[in-house]
Amino acid sequence: MKPYYVTTAIAYPNAAPHVGHAYEYIATDAIARFKRLDGYDVRFLTGTDEHGLKVAQAAAAAGVPTAALARRNSDVFQRMQEALNISFDRFIRTTDADHHEASKELWRRMSAAGDIYLDNYSGWYSVRDERFFVESETQLVDGTRLTVETGTPVTWTEEQTYFFRLSAYTDKLLAHYHANPDFIAPETRRNEVISFVSGGLDDLSISRTSFDWGVQVPEHPDHVMYVWVDALTNYLTGAGFPDTDSELFRRYWPADLHMIGKDIIRFHAVYWPAFLMSAGIELPRRIFAHGFLHNRGEKMSKSVGNIVDPVALAEALGVDQVRYFLLREVPFGQDGSYSDEAIVTRINTDLANELGNLAQRSLSMVAKNLDGRVPNPGEFADADAALLATADGLLERVRGHFDAQAMHLALEAIWLMLGDANKYFSVQQPWVLRKSESEADQARFRTTLYVTCEVVRIAALLIQPVMPESAGKILDLLGQAPNQRSFAAVGVRLTPGTALPPPTGVFPRYQPPQPPEGK
């Protein structure tokens, strides 16, 4: 099996997770599941970034030890991922012992390359962004200095720190971007990065002495690594680094895909490849920066009180329903918006009507009229062959969309086919054919139900990465054994005569809770 290594960004556990975190995890999980079903040996890494000033300050404000807050909040992130059915292979925490060793080895390699030196740093620092800013990237607003880009407050910092010779990598980075046009996606982010790097790069401060919550610099324990040096290294740690001779590292590095938010593209597409070039380590193959998820078009924030809790949402509406909505509603890579009305519409229109109702109606007819067994079809008419051909061609189209991280287009293609299937079912009128005493009509009845069940099967196979539990239930209803559920089974038709279990509904319509009478 061909290996495939995919990662999410690791989240800061300084506050509770929100639906924006869930969006990235669900998208990456869908890709990991797709690759597994498509015959790949997948390694899927996610986790939390427990170091940095942001976490230390949150702990101080809460009056708890930093390690305790980081551990407690990381547990919340891990439980959220488990609640959303995220199929990670490792949930890494940057406090893990093997991660400290990996970070120190990366530092040693960059130092041995002559790319690290000691100097004095003075400039503006944003704790919230864990990022340095030059004067021209800030502005005074009502007496407070804020970053122009993110609007977060900055403080003036002066200390002796180690620097990384980022300036030496300007041309090498640009050469890599041009030689590997798919390295950064989508195109808008790629253009942003190329524009930024083309302007020339300054050396980067990569250690701090003003606090001690982080990975200690080798041979210089009074310095801790700048949180992004340590954080980015997690992708190497997850592949077994620094043991580059290990089976894990040789099999999975370089990473095939880093899935991140657009706000951290500079760290991943500029700093990270420069660190790896310095250390003599192969670069990841692709970095995809997705957009932000807003609430009714507004940025989610605690101060506004419009943050959506993904676990509460899943408990109210269903895990698979939330997973489907987030990947279907928003063109992946662009900003998108959440609203209660939009998700209920998707549940009732796409899931309950288009897929759930089609499966329920066809399987109920099979149970009632054909002894609960897959019907034996007659000769396929043009309408049958056309619908089957559309369904048969879906895997290649869906694969292409997943490889481009365009899950919304993959789902759109599947639902277009389901729209065709519903029209086909209405035109063929199996409920009329069933009552006919004509043998030809009975053959059409069996053929119509066979074709409908077959295209529902193909749809269920292909939606497994997005809705694993619900797709599994549909495949159960179609009598598909566990070894008939990989994408290799797409072209293997339903076997006539297969006994099917009694049909049950998979996607109930969502009815909002009614207030008690008299209220």
Swiss-Prot record:
Enzyme class: ligase
GO CC list: cytoplasm
Source species of the chain: Mycobacterium bovis (strain ATCC BAA-935 / AF2122/97)
The family this protein is said to belong to: Belongs to the class-I aminoacyl-tRNA synthetase family. MetG type 2B subfamily.
Binding-site residues for ATP, renumbered to this chain: K302
BP term (GO), one: methionyl-tRNA aminoacylation
One Pfam family linked to the record: Anticodon_3
EC number assigned by the record: 6.1.1.10
Protein's UniProt name: Methionine--tRNA ligase
Motif 'HIGH' region, residue range(s) on this chain: 11-21
Job of this protein: Is required not only for elongation of protein synthesis but also for the initiation of all mRNA translation through initiator tRNA(fMet) aminoacylation.
Keyword Aminoacyl-tRNA synthetase recorded: yes
GO MF, one example: methionine-tRNA ligase activity
Subcellular locations according to the entry: Cytoplasm
Database matches in HAMAP family: Met_tRNA_synth_type2 (MF_01228)
Stored InterPro entries: aa-tRNA-synth_I_CS, Anticodon_Met, Met-tRNA_synth, Met-tRNA_synth_2, Methionyl/Leucyl_tRNA_Synth, MetRS_core, Rossmann-like_a/b/a_fold, tRNAsynth_Ia_anticodon-bd
